[in-house]
Amino acid sequence: GVDLAAVPSLARKQVEILRDGASSQYGSGAIAGVLNFLLRDDDEGFELVTKYGSMHEGDGTNYMVSANVGMPLGDNGFLNITGELRDVEGTVRSIIRDDVAYAVANGYAPVANFQNINTYTNEVPQYWGQPDVEDDIKLFFNSAIELNDTTEVYAFGNHAERTVEGGFFYRNVVGRASNLTPGASTGQRGGVYRGPAVDPLTGLALAANAGGVPSVLVGDMDGGSSCIDGIPLGGQGGITPDPSFLSQVTADANCFSFIETIPAGFVPRFGGDNEDSAVAVGIRGELDYGTGVAYDVSVQRGSNRSDFFIRNTINASLGPATPRDFVPGGQEQTETLYNANFVYTVDAGFASDLNVAFGAEYREEEFDLFAGDAASYALGPLASQGFSSSSNGFGGFPADTSASQDSTAFYIDLEADITDTITMQAAVRNEDFSTFGDTTNYKLAGIVRLTEKLRLRGALSTGFHAPTAGQASITNVTTQIVNGALTDQGTLPLFSALARLSSSMRPASSTLVTPRTTTPTVR
């Protein structure tokens, strides 16, 4: 979605909300309305705002420093600049997980020290709260200068960056109370700790209907069959690893289980370094040969990039050779827009002139995936023995991938006061995408002023939400072990041959009817 946090609040002069569907005017995504930000255009003055606070529990400390300055640009222009710096400490609102409390109560010592589980806080073994936001820097500018009485050149843009980090769920080692119920889910992390049901006397897997006890998964490093299949769990509460089998696995260099190296389990920490940049340049004014036509022609380019990281996790298929921190890659969306908009009025015999707005837009989109480090997507030697591949929690992208699409749109919008009490609007927009074809959307809206204090409003509109270049065209395939066989899994292009076999895919569409009554706001 749109990241409104990239625009500092001091850069905003006013926010307008169009609550009716607006795909017929603004295109994809404007199904339920539009937010229009009017930027500050002061050519003088300085404003400084600082904020500091924290939560009652003592965490969540945050500060913000923001400043805005306006200055003249020549004799008939302005340059307005806003900067903001913010830091937000994460919060933790977790309680002790039932499975961890159960393990502690039943004598599984490794989880008693919560710092062994959660590297972020030693208070609870599960991170739950708002993420950390560090080095949140935002810069924004807005400018314009008059060339003559009817023409103005303008430009605005921004650069924002920040690092965000949060936590995932706890990876359970030995299970919970359900261990005592045959056939029930143990709650152990699959692909890391959860082993097959095993014979408690041999540690070897039993058939699904042959009983057995839960176990902790064991891998055979040379791919042979010299190791047991799992360390049986039993004892008090059904969560105690059998000490003799655990010693046997530990003593054999060819056998490996993550209970040896990470006996308390773990909580991955996931985040990203985000950058958002955009610039728009345009010219607006009135045509000077008596037509009364106002115009606005512009070009805009923007990009958003995220480079991900994940730490305090593993690639289980690599066994003891796994790193604990990974760089799984990144992604970037880049868009370029060319707009031409025109407005004029004509006398059509109504109570007011008929306002005619029309225009065209050409959009280019590009989406790029950047490959992660090799360990973040590797299929290690233990993958065929039930250990999951890729960095646990967020697997890395295996290769650089790019996708693109473009679209061309035309629209017309008519509005007039038909009588002194009735206002009507009609709009239609056609947009043609290189990836899936064209779509036409319309809007009919009106206002009836019943009294000075009561108005009846209504709108009938159609809308759509087109897939982005990344959603429509990206390929990201990883290899996993499913039921003992190597299987490719991932995301395929929306219009690939395989996707076409599954269903006929079109952009999401809508029909919106919005009747309402309104009264003037009392100020």
Can you describe what each PLM-predicted range is?
Residues V2-A5, R12, I17, G29-T50, ...:
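N-terminal periplasmic accessory domains that precede
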Residues S9-R12, R40, G74-N76, E146-T150, ...:
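Outer-membrane beta-barrel channels and translocator barrels
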Residues G33, E44, Y63-A67, D135-F141, ...:
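Hydrophobic, lipid-facing positions within transmembrane beta-strands of outer-membrane proteins
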Residues D41, Y52-H56, L85-E89, H159-T163, ...:
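Transmembrane beta-strands of outer-membrane beta-barrel pores
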Residues Y52-M55, V124-G129, G265-R269, A321-G330, ...:
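Extracellular loop and loop/strand-boundary signature of outer-membrane beta-barrel proteins
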Residues E57-A264, P268-E286:
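Transmembrane beta-barrel wall of Gram-negative outer-membrane proteins
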Residues P268, G272-N274, V279, D288, ...:
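Outer-membrane beta-barrel transmembrane domain signature of Gram-negative proteins
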Residues S303-D307, N312, E364-L369, D373, ...:
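Surface-exposed extracellular loop regions of Gram-negative outer-membrane beta-barrel proteins
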